[in-house]
């Protein structure tokens, strides 16, 4: 954890710093280094990269807009990203982000302007230089490196210096993400009619996080201001809880994950699953819509039953893009293990009367595969069954008594105190009732037969439509 400092003499004499807001905080520790860094900064060269508008990227009204960050370390988490592979990070971000933020502060976040150059050369998205900017030379450096926008922090700068740097950046054609974290700074930003304002949920003086900061300060701005919630987003429900905010800056929660693709899909869009996939077209539509889980059914009674060969073909397409789930109903352990290994499944979904002992055995035989247990809900006592499996399962699914039939159980009977953090709601969810299903705030939905026009074959058009509703909820 970064320790707070008093400002050194060089910082105290540096023109334009918000001394009152910085003194004796962790911000002072960072600025004490930054004033020496900028002293030797001599920007040179010409910009070759085209300018891309951050404002335009965040003006998209279709769903949420994400500024996804390339971040390897922080004062609170230390070196949380051991494998800082920018190519892998960009491959994940490219079809999810509206813009990419690159940490350029070297000492405490271990960033670099070289990272920004690398990213800009490999994306058409707007790129933000995320640094503690205190002088024009840093703006020049960011501009030459290819930044399309910069971050200016009102917690760090005096109001006059902020306006000077804001105008200087705009003269170069750069957008500015202005960061506020107090009521006073938010009012100042509002009076300037700024186009883009970031509300930091982390108090950089204490490093404490409170999502209520964005909830309260966002209300001060008009609908014409592009408000961005920064910091503190760890789950999809965190996003949903910030009603009225459509733009989010997210970093360490993604790059610190062992599986950035799965983490991004679940956190940004929800832990949603489409079950009964039988064709490449359907699987591709599910991938394109950022579902987290693709279900392959291995049950001869189902019209969506897959052969092992077909499942292997689909699994190859899914690899690295979406997690695969093998769905079984009271199948033998031997057969489930064989199929899981042959197909390369990530999850087994048990949709019958499988016992705790069966799951314990599967864990021993398939340590790399996670377990989902589905329950067919008829009455209140069915919810009690979840407790026996709690420690053994990654997720639970609440389904109707006739899975795959397009019918729902009575969602009104779901206990108010049920733990929703590992449950997907299932059973007859389609375009007619998906918004109602989302109101129950489970981590995700399990979708199946209502996404079909022909029985057993998913309709890509219906998949697109239902996920559009989910992403705009």
What do the predicted segments below correspond to?
Residues 3, 8-81:
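An N-cap/entry alpha-helix motif that binds or orients negatively charged groups
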Residues 67-85, 126-133, 177-179, 229, ...:
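Active-site mouth loops of central-metabolism enzymes
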Residues 72-83, 88-109, 189-218, 293, ...:
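Glycine/Thr-rich beta-alpha phosphate-binding loop at enzyme active sites
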Residues 76-170, 174-177, 185-189, 214-217, ...:
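N-terminal active-site wall of soluble small-molecule enzyme domains
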Residues 134-146, 182-192, 229-250, 278-289, ...:
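Catalytic cores of alpha/beta
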Residues 144-161, 198-208, 244-267, 291-303, ...:
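Glycine-rich phosphate-binding active-site loops on the catalytic face of alpha/beta enzymes
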Residues 194-273, 395-432, 443:
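Active-site/ligand-binding-proximal alpha/beta "capping" segment
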Residues 211-221, 254-275, 308-318, 361, ...:
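C-terminal helical cap(s) of enzyme catalytic domains, especially alpha/beta-barrels
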């Amino acid at each position: 954890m970064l320790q707070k400092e008093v400002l050194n003499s060089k910082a105290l004499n540096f023109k334009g710093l918000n001394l009152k807001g910085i003194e004796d905080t962790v911000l002072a520790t960072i600025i004490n280094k930054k004033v020496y860094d900028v002293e030797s900064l001599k920007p040179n060269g010409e910009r070759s990269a085209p300018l891309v508008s951050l404002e335009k990227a965040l003006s998209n009204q279709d769903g949420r807009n994400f500024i996804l960050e390339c971040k390897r370390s922080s004062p609170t988490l230390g070196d949380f990203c051991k494998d800082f592979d920018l190519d892998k990070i960009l491959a994940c971000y490219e079809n999810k982000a509206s813009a990419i933020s690159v940490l350029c502060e070297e000492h405490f976040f271990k960033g670099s302007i070289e990272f920004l150059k690398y990213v800009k050369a490999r994306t058409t998205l707007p790129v933000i230089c995320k640094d503690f900017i205190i002088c024009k030379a840093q703006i020049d450096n960011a501009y030459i490196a290819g930044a399309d926008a910069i971050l200016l922090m009102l917690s760090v700068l005096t109001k006059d210096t902020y306006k000077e740097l804001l105008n200087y950046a705009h003269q170069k054609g750069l957008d500015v993400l202005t960061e506020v974290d107090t009521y006073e700074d938010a009012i100042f930003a509002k009076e300037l009619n700024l186009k883009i304002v970031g509300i930091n949920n982390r108090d950089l003086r204490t490093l404490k996080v409170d999502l209520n900061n964005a909830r309260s300060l966002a209300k001060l701005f008009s609908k014409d201001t592009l408000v961005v919630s920064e910091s503190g987003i760890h789950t999809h429900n965190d996003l949903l809880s910030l009603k009225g905010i459509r733009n989010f800056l997210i970093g360490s929660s993604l790059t610190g994950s062992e599986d950035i693709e799965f983490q991004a899909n679940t956190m940004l869009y929800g832990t949603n699953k489409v079950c009964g996939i039988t064709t490449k077209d359907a699987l591709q539509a599910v991938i394109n819509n950022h579902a987290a889980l693709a279900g392959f059914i291995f049950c001869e009674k189902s019209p969506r039953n897959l052969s092992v060969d077909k499942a292997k073909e689909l699994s190859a397409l899914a690899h690295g893009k979406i997690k695969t789930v093998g769905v079984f109903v009271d199948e033998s352990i031997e057969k489930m293990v064989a199929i899981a290994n042959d197909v390369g499944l990530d999850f087994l979904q048990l949709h019958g009367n499988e016992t705790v002992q069966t799951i314990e055995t599967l864990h021993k035989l398939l340590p790399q595969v996670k377990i989902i247990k589905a329950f067919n809900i008829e009455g209140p006592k069915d919810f009690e069954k979840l407790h026996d499996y709690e420690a053994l399962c990654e997720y639970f699914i609440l389904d109707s008594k006739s899975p795959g039939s397009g019918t729902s159980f009575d969602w009104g009977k779901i206990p108010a105190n049920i733990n929703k953090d590992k449950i997907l709601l299932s059973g007859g969810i389609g375009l007619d009732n998906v918004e109602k299903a989302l109101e129950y705030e489970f981590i995700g939905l399990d979708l199946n037969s209502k996404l079909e026009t022909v029985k057993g074959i998913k309709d890509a058009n219906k998949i697109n439509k239902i996920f559009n509703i989910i992403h705009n909820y």
